[in-house]
């Protein structure tokens, strides 16, 4: 049965069970395309927000009867129709002859047979409102279209064992169906999105039959580049006005408008006339051209320009205070007019000073400073390759350390403790009013001494850590080397920022007039940046120290050839590799080091076939996200140890128990109990929870038993995963700070981690190759999804309270729940079908 323009309201929420089924929420208005589609009794083909799919007919209710099509000259009866759609906030497009101007919107006659007209999104710039939409509808759109149109993070709703958004499509930009192509007449007088200036009218006789918008032609309309035609004062701010293009006599300029407003290429004739030697300056970095070269502007302007001297005198509108580069005289002399891109020899873009973007650096997002394009050589860490190149082994910096494990650990802990005490000494001078003139005048010498010591102690620590990294590079397995390299990179990035800011402070001679601030300001200066980055150094150093000390037996081996090491710690204190810290720092007693080291669990002996487990470290803030890495095909004991270590890292119940509310504390305790449930692998004690039908004779009895056994395991841990996701979405919806939702995300990671481990274990035990491949692929997909979630969570914490970053984290976690459900279903299907 076919019907046109049939509308239905959703009576219940609908969770799709297949790809063809349409997801909707209670109260949604659907367009019914076909009832009992394809011979399926009770299933209707409907459309919602541009998506088509089948829906169960008993979950929707028809609003009106079918609307019969009428010829173009007939006039439909709009009365009841308008009343019904007015209640649903939809727009019924009437015939052009029967439109009521009081209650409906005027739509061109070409839409008279299109039925329900749903307003598309704007085609122009975001500032332009192409269609006038009532305020109530605009609020509805903003509240239901997700984070792109509202500032609130949209979290999906749990229905059964899955999650459904209020609107199913992610990042859905087109809320309404876009109407079909327009008729032959122009409808809207709106310029395209690239034209940001005023609309230029075109004579009526030049309108093309197929044109929809009144757009000026590309040739012969503008006397100057289009971007220079912006009359509004707001659009002219911080833009550059270039002189008009040069044309040959009788030939129009056909060069299209480019990305930058630069004069078009000159012709040979005009180029020869303009071959005048003068220093050319970078746009955006010079004084006004006419002020410096008025003689050229007034007396040497060619006739082809067709402009007066007054026009030329204000050719450039340049912001002040920016340095510039001048092209050498030889360059302009040797350059031929044919080889130039334009009238003026414009040098390459001079990178802006990095201090403007350094203002946003704080203690968490401290690495953004190293990628701001600074022109200073010692801060050129703007790419991953340059960062990694700084860690490349060189004979002078990263030479191997020939130390025995006890001596290396003793030296490492001494350097770490010295560094922590230096940072604590600096932090003790930072108070609420420490930047006021009176405080700075009394303590500026102490602050300067503390800053110098922090930089010195961090440099000494880095020297030792790079040597340990060089030792790790010689191991047969590079897993430990890669882990140490990531941890060392964070410390080295901090050292680069501290070195640069300390250098800048010394450049200004620690002037009180510069450093003393009597009133609060939004920008961060060099001293603020130094303090904020220095706060993060002890945690990063502690994480690296723990990794090195845990694997000291692997990294360090005594070298009998080095006689200066035979005498133990006393000789290493006098060796050239050790730099004595300040005498005021008192390190721990060597016995304390050994006691502290032996109190930590050491890993079993490593072999070539067993890579070191890199998940064990005490960690610093966010360290569990930075260090998260799943090692495939690991044993049950290693997996459980890794789970326990990840759970203990930044345990919020131990760190901030007094700051948590009662319901938060109980929620964390409940989740921790679920997470600690082990993954069973003893199938002899297992009893099937239900008898599963078997129709697949190709699967062996043993493989089927394994699939059913681990399916029950998946069912248990999948419920724990859903509970962890519910808790995460709840704290995101209530706008909890990063320390709360990061802690919740760890429970999500650990729960899904168990599903990956189940897949790896099953891969090793099943005999059928096709089943092994399917399980491995599903497990690998889950593992990659976990890494994506870790990165998304880290970005959400770094950019908090960015709605976009939080929404991306929510989307990734939602995808994880779907992939986990598919993984669980695949085990059941392989066992029963």
From Swiss-Prot:
Biased composition (Low complexity): 368-396
Function field: Scaffolding protein which plays a central coordinating role for tyrosine-kinase-based signaling related to cell adhesion. As a focal adhesion protein, plays a role in embryonic fibroblast migration. May play an important role in integrin beta-1 or B cell antigen receptor (BCR) mediated signaling in B- and T-cells. Integrin beta-1 stimulation leads to recruitment of various proteins including CRKl and SHPTP2 to the tyrosine phosphorylated form.
Compartments where located: Cytoplasm, Cell cortex; Nucleus; Golgi apparatus; Cell projection, Lamellipodium
Coiled coil: none
Post-translational modification: Polyubiquitinated by ITCH/AIP4, leading to proteasomal degradation. PTK2/FAK1 phosphorylates the protein at the YDYVHL motif (conserved among all cas proteins) following integrin stimulation. The SRC family kinases (FYN, SRC, LCK and CRK) are recruited to the phosphorylated sites and can phosphorylate other tyrosine residues. Ligation of either integrin beta-1 or B-cell antigen receptor on tonsillar B-cells and B-cell lines promotes tyrosine phosphorylation and both integrin and BCR-mediated tyrosine phosphorylation requires an intact actin network.
Assigned protein family: Belongs to the CAS family.
Subunit comment: Homodimer. Forms heterodimers with BCAR1/p130cas. Forms complexes with PTK2B/RAFTK, adapter protein CRKL and LYN kinase. Part of a complex composed of NEDD9, AURKA and CTTN; within the complex NEDD9 acts as a scaffold protein and is required for complex formation. Part of a ternary complex composed of SMAD3, ITCH/AIP4 and NEDD9/HEF1; within the complex NEDD9/HEF1 interacts (via N-terminus) with ITCH/AIP4 (via WW domains); the complex mediates ubiquitination and proteasomal degradation of NEDD9/HEF1.
Cited InterPro entries: CAS_C, CAS_fam, NEDD9_SH3, Serine_rich_dom, Serine_rich_sf, SH3-like_dom_sf, SH3_domain
SMART domains: SH3
PTM annotation (Phosphothreonine): residues: 803
Any GO CC annotation of this UniProt entry: cytosol
Swiss-Prot/TrEMBL keywords: Cell adhesion, Cell cycle, Cell division, Cell junction, Cell membrane, Cell projection, Cytoplasm, Cytoskeleton, Golgi apparatus, Growth regulation, Membrane, Mitosis, Nucleus, Phosphoprotein, SH3 domain, Ubl conjugation
Domain description: Contains a central domain containing multiple potential SH2-binding sites and a C-terminal domain containing a divergent helix-loop-helix (HLH) motif. The SH2-binding sites putatively bind CRKL SH2 domains. The HLH motif confers specific interaction with the HLH protein ID2. It is absolutely required for the induction of pseudohyphal growth in yeast and mediates homodimerization and heterodimerization with BCAR1/p130cas.
PANTHER family in alphabetical order: CAS SCAFFOLDING PROTEIN (PTHR10654), ENHANCER OF FILAMENTATION 1 (PTHR10654:SF20)
Record domain SH3: where: 3-65
UniProt induction comment: Induced by TGF-beta treatment in bone marrow macrophages.
Protein name, UniProt field: Enhancer of filamentation 1
Originating organism: Mus musculus (Mouse)
Gene3D superfamilies for the chain: Alpha-catenin/vinculin-like (1.20.120.230), Serine-rich domain (1.20.120.830), SH3 Domains (2.30.30.40)
Ranges of Basic and acidic residues composition bias in the record: 248-258, 331-343
Record has Ubl conjugation as a keyword: yes
GO BP, one annotated term: positive regulation of protein localization
Region (Interacts with CTTN): 350-833
Post-translational modification Phosphotyrosine, affected residues: 91, 163, 165, 176, 188, 213, 222, 316
Keyword Translocase included in the entry's annotation: no
Motif, Caspase cleavage related site: chain positions: 359-362
């Amino acid at each position: 049965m076919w019907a046109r323009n049939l509308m239905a309201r959703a009576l219940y929420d609908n969770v799709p069970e297949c790809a063809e089924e349409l997801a909707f929420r209670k109260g949604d208005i659907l367009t019914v395309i076909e009832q009992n589609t394809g011979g399926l009794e009770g299933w209707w083909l409907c459309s919602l927000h541009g998506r088509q799919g089948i829906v169960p007919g008993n979950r929707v209710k028809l609003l009106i009867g079918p609307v019969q099509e009428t010829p173009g000259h007939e006039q439909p009866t709009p009365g009841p129709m308008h009343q019904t759609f007015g209640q649903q906030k939809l727009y019924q497009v009437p015939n052009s002859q029967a439109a009521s101007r009081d209650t409906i919107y005027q739509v061109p006659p070409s839409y008279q047979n299109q039925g329900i007209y749903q307003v598309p999104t704007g085609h122009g710039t975001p500032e332009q409102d192409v269609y006038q939409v009532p305020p109530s509808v605009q609020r509805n759109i903003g509240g239901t279209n997700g984070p792109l149109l509202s500032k609130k993070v949209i979290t999906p709703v749990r229905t059964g064992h899955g999650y459904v958004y209020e609107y199913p499509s992610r990042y859905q930009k087109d809320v309404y169906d876009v109407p079909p192509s327009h008729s032959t007449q122009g409808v809207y007088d709106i310029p395209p999105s690239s034209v940001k200036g005023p609309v230029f009218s075109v004579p009526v006789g030049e309108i093309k039959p197929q044109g929809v918008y009144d757009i000026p032609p590309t040739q012969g309309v503008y006397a100057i580049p289009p971007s220079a035609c912006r009359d509004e004062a707001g659009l002219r701010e911080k833009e550059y006005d270039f002189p008009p293009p040069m044309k040959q006599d009788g030939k129009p300029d056909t060069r299209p408008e480019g990305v930058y407003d630069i004069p078009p290429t000159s012709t040979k004739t005009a180029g020869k006339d303009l071959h005048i030697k003068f220093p050319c300056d970078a746009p955006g970095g010079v004084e006004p051209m006419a002020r410096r070269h008025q003689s050229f502007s007034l007396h040497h302007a060619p006739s082809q320009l067709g402009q007066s001297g007054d026009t030329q005198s204000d050719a450039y509108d340049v912001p002040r205070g920016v340095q510039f580069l001048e092209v050498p005289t030889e360059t302009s002399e040797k350059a031929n007019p044919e080889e130039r891109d334009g009238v003026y020899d414009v040098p390459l873009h001079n990178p802006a000073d990095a201090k403007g973007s350094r203002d946003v650096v704080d203690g968490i997002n401290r690495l953004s400073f190293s990628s701001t394009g600074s022109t200073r050589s010692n801060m050129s860490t703007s790419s991953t390759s340059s960062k990694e190149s700084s860690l490349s082994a060189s004979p002078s910096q990263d030479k191997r350390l020939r130390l025995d494990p006890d001596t290396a650990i003793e030296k490492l802990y001494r350097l770490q403790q010295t560094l922590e005490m230096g940072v604590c000494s600096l932090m003790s001078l930072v108070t609420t009013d420490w930047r006021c003139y009176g405080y700075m005048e009394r303590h500026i010498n102490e602050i300067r001494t503390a800053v110098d010591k922090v930089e010195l102690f961090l440099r000494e620590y880095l020297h030792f850590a790079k040597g340990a990294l060089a030792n790790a590079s010689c191991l047969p397995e590079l897993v430990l080397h890669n882990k140490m390299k990531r941890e060392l990179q964070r410390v080295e990035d901090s050292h680069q920022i501290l070195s640069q800011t300390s250098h800048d402070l010394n450049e200004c001679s620690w002037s009180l007039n510069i450093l003393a601030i009597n009133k609060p300001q939004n920008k961060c200066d060099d001293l603020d940046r130094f303090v904020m980055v220095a706060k993060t150094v002890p945690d990063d150093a502690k994480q690296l120290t723990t990794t090195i000390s845990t694997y000291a037996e692997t990294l360090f081996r005594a070298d009998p050839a080095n006689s200066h090491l035979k005498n133990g710690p006393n000789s290493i204190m006098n060796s050239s590799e050790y730099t004595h810290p300040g005498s005021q720092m008192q390190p721990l007693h060597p016995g304390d080091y050994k006691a502290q080291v032996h109190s930590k669990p050491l890993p079993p002996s490593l072999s070539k076939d067993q890579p070191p487990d890199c998940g064990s470290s005490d960690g610093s803030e966010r360290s569990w996200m930075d260090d998260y890495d799943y090692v495939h095909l690991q044993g049950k004991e290693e997996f459980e140890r890794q789970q326990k270590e990840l759970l203990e890292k930044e345990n919020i119940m131990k760190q901030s128990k007094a700051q948590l509310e009662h319901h938060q504390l109980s929620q964390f305790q409940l989740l921790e109990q679920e997470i600690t449930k082990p993954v069973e692998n003893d199938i002899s004690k297992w009893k099937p929870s239900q008898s599963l039908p078997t129709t697949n004779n190709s699967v062996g009895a043993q493989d089927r038993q394994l699939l059913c056994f681990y399916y029950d395991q998946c069912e248990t841990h999948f419920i724990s995963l859903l509970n962890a996701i519910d808790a995460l979405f709840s704290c995101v919806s209530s706008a909890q700070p990063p320390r709360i939702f990061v802690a919740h995300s760890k429970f999500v990671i650990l729960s899904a981690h168990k599903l990956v481990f189940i897949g790896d274990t099953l891969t090793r035990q099943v005999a059928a190759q096709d089943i092994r491949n399917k399980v491995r692929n599903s497990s690998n997909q889950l593992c990659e999804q976990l890494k994506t979630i870790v990165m998304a969570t880290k970005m959400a914490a770094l950019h908090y309270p960015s709605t976009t970053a939080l929404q991306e984290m929510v989307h990734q976690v939602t995808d994880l729940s779907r992939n986990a459900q598919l993984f669980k279903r695949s085990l059941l299907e392989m066992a029963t079908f």
